Amino acid sequence: MNKVTLLHEGKAKKVWQTDNPDLIIQEFKDDATAFNNKKKGSIADKGVTNNAIASRLFTMLGENGIPTHFVGKLNDRDMLCKKLDILLIEVVTRNIAAGSLVRRYGFKEGTVLSKPIVELYLKNDELDDPLMNEDHAVALGLGTCEEVAHLKAMAKKINSLLVPWFAERKLRLVDFKLEFGRHKGEILLGDEISPDTCRFWDAESGEKLDKDRFRLDLGGVEDAYSEVKRRVLEQ
């Protein structure tokens, strides 16, 4: 499968059109950003690590009935995917209080939530990806009521699969962001699942093993990503 035209270059990936109009290639980069591109840097081999992690997780989710855009891992940095009409809705699922949930509502960091919280954000960097509800999403023309409800239901199902899967690998899934898109009339999970889009804490030590190490200048970013990769690829 060949890269024909660069369709889009984002913060973490390049998206290429292939010679098949229904398929694209996601090329994972080493670039790192935080706070909606206000902080920039690079993490050695991040693209290779995230491609490996996301490929494994998409495979697992597909085996458990979650429709995704994943077709296959082509090489260290490239992932073959179905071409999606991306929905401009970011779906964040939270199991443990951290990040903006702590800042907005006064939760103590590390509080285990009585039930997962599913939040919707408008995918718009210029507006700093504002939090919104289902009515906003429908009013903005981002999807129908049924589609937005379906996204939240899919996020809950994905969470129910990921939490125990990571727990077996001694990782706590604190929270994570999902993106979806339409492909031939079906809504599929897209983008990636990786330490760029999830918060992972070591189940025993509580050590942060995700992009918070970059955001908060904690150091050891490459080692944290590599450790998540090692555990994810364990059989």
Swiss-Prot record:
Pathway: Purine metabolism; IMP biosynthesis via de novo pathway; 5-amino-1-(5-phospho-D-ribosyl)imidazole-4-carboxamide from 5-amino-1-(5-phospho-D-ribosyl)imidazole-4-carboxylate: step 1/2
EC number annotated for this UniProt entry: 6.3.2.6
GO terms classed as biological process: 'de novo' IMP biosynthetic process; cobalamin biosynthetic process
Keywords: ATP-binding, Ligase, Nucleotide-binding, Purine biosynthesis
GO MF entries: ATP binding; phosphoribosylaminoimidazolesuccinocarboxamide synthase activity
Matching Pfam families: SAICAR_synt (PF01259)
Highest taxon, organism lineage: Bacteria
Annotated CDD domains: SAICAR_synt_PurC
Catalytic activity: 5-amino-1-(5-phospho-D-ribosyl)imidazole-4-carboxylate + L-aspartate + ATP = (2S)-2-[5-amino-1-(5-phospho-beta-D-ribosyl)imidazole-4-carboxamido]succinate + ADP + phosphate + 2 H(+)
Protein family membership: Belongs to the SAICAR synthetase family.
Record's protein name: Phosphoribosylaminoimidazole-succinocarboxamide synthase
Record organism: Chlorobaculum tepidum (strain ATCC 49652 / DSM 12025 / NBRC 103806 / TLS) (Chlorobium tepidum)
UniProt lineage: Bacteria, Pseudomonadati, Chlorobiota, Chlorobiia, Chlorobiales
Gene: purC
